Amino acid sequence: MKNIRNFCIIAHIDHGKSTLADRLLEFTNTIQVTNGQMLDDMDLEKERGITIKSHAIQMEYNYKGEKYILNLIDTPGHVDFSYEVSRSIAACEGALLIVDASQGVQAQTISNLYMAIEHDLEIIPIINKCDMASAMPEEVEDEIVELLGCKRDEIIRASGKTGMGVEEILAAVIERIPHPEGDEEAPLQALIFDSVFNSFRGIIAYFKIENGVIRKGDKVKFFNTGKEYDADEVGVLKMELVPRNELRTGDVGYIISGIKTSKEVKVGDTITHVARPCDKAIAGFEEVKPMVFAGVYPIEAEDFEDLRASLEKLQLNDASLTFQPESSLALGFGFRCGFLGLLHMEIVQERLDREFDMNVITTVPNVSYNIYDKQGNMKEVHNPGGMPDPTLIDHIEEPYIKASIITTTDYIGPIMTLCLGKRGELLKQEYISGNRVEIYYNMPLGEIVIDFYDRLKSISKGYASFDYHPNGFRPSKLVKLDIMLNGEPVDALSTLIHFDNAYDMGRRMCEKLKELIPRQQFEIAIQAAIGAKIIARETIKAVRKDVTAKCYGGDVSRKRKLLEKQKKGKKRMKQIGNVEVPQKAFLAVLKLD
């Protein structure tokens, strides 16, 4: 146990943590030299160059004549996936804080760092990408010293590309990170920090043993669900699973016990023995709360059950995805899914498409609102369709967040304009170093859901970074905006929106739909309405045949007769014709800027 070190890697997006992890794995001979990103094994992760899932891997390293076991847990850096980080942090004693030498400290670095400090982890600061021409290691060192209060000589300079500094990092991990504390004689206590689904073996749970020993064939039970299992196989995580006969305190490993449903494995649960259970569960981490909700519908109605199965499988290794069935007049049966943020929503959609071959339509994302009626009862609504009649509502409360934005001084003006446009209120601003500022805002989550992050990146030319935390509910003047086609509301396009923005949004949605809905044989009226009041309208003109073309000269009444006849036909068509809204129109309305 003295020779085990458990550590994770914390960094902002794109500061090079997965590449540096590859170098550590190569240096310890865990893998052969490869073309990169061993731990990002989803195609999607490779393509987008981001880490979505946490990954655990064990390395062996000889240092000063002793053999050490190092368990590395790679974590994502994107704001949507901070729950993945909190789980990984709970399973470690130390963390490598990686900062890009050319970009410096960013919002996500800070928020993940605070999480690590709360769990009392030993922090090893590393400046990565020091081989780049644009690197400014001196200035970045100043920022880190100010942030952590560490000494300058504790900061390691490294490069994931050239492999510089890798030996120093491994030495620091062994010297500075404490070994796991725990009692091998005590009853078994192991924290589950991840689970993956394997179609042959069922669910594989990854855990870290806090106290006690687990052996192959033991009868174990999961503390929170109370279910009992046989440990068919336990082992450690190398590049593949390596079975072992027993795992001791401080080890990180996996257990296979033929579990088939995802509900039974709760990440953050405690594994213990049936014969000698522990008294209490390990204080894990809070349940993940989805922030953004959207309807997900199959394009073909008969794929509904397949979609349910696919979502259940996704939920196995994405604990934060929630879903419940709902139905819509325009789209039929589907699910109301809860996501952590917009990136998460996009990724779930892509994974449905790639891994399960499901084509889905997603509706406008929204957040959950608390609605109070005149009697003072509260109802939580995730879906604009679930809104009670406006006459019964006393007031509506919407969720707020506390956002922290880090940027250079050049972009403060445009960013403040953006935040004010999104109904943000400035809390404070602090200068981190020379020309870097951290700005804090209180903002409604509903304003951020749709396009805030993209716009922040584009007005700051990619230099601003953004992070947020929930900050309670507040009363707000919200109205339900309906979009109607020929007087029929399309429920998938309804949104709850602040009264001040409703007119503008209604007008833009109508204009966008006018471009995207194909012309029919009859004219289509696109209207935006609040209750019974129409606030915007666009008309798609009918496609019509020139019925008078066959008349040569002759009497005007002959032409009029043909035109009247055409008009009657169009009128009849309009009564029975229905308008299909194409999928790309749904997506375009989401991305209105």
Swiss-Prot record:
The keyword Protein biosynthesis applies. Residues 2-181 form the tr-type G domain. GO terms for cellular component: plasma membrane. It is found in: Cell inner membrane. GO terms for biological process: positive regulation of translation. GO terms for molecular function: GTP binding; GTPase activity; ribosome binding; translation elongation factor activity. It is an enzyme of class 3 (hydrolase). GTP binds at D14, H15, G16, K17, S18, T19, N128, K129, C130, D131. Keywords: Cell inner membrane, Cell membrane, GTP-binding, Hydrolase, Membrane, Nucleotide-binding, Protein biosynthesis. InterPro entries: EF-4, EFG_III/V, EFG_V-like, EFTu-like_2, LepA_C_sf, LepA_CTD, LepA_IV, P-loop_NTPase. Pfam families: EFG_C (PF00679), GTP_EFTU (PF00009), GTP_EFTU_D2 (PF03144), LepA_C (PF06421). Its EC number is 3.6.5.n1. It is a peripheral membrane protein. Coiled coil: none annotated. It catalyses: GTP + H2O = GDP + phosphate + H(+). PROSITE patterns: G_TR_2. Required for accurate and efficient protein synthesis under certain stress conditions. May act as a fidelity factor of the translation reaction, by catalyzing a one-codon backward translocation of tRNAs on improperly translocated ribosomes. Back-translocation proceeds from a post-translocation (POST) complex to a pre-translocation (PRE) complex, thus giving elongation factor G a second chance to translocate the tRNAs correctly. Binds to ribosomes in a GTP-dependent manner. Belongs to the TRAFAC class translation factor GTPase superfamily. Classic translation factor GTPase family. LepA subfamily. PANTHER family: TRANSLATION FACTOR GUF1 HOMOLOG, CHLOROPLASTIC, TRANSLATION FACTOR GUF1-RELATED. This is Elongation factor 4. It comes from Bacteroides thetaiotaomicron (strain ATCC 29148 / DSM 2079 / JCM 5827 / CCUG 10774 / NCTC 10582 / VPI-5482 / E50). The gene is lepA.
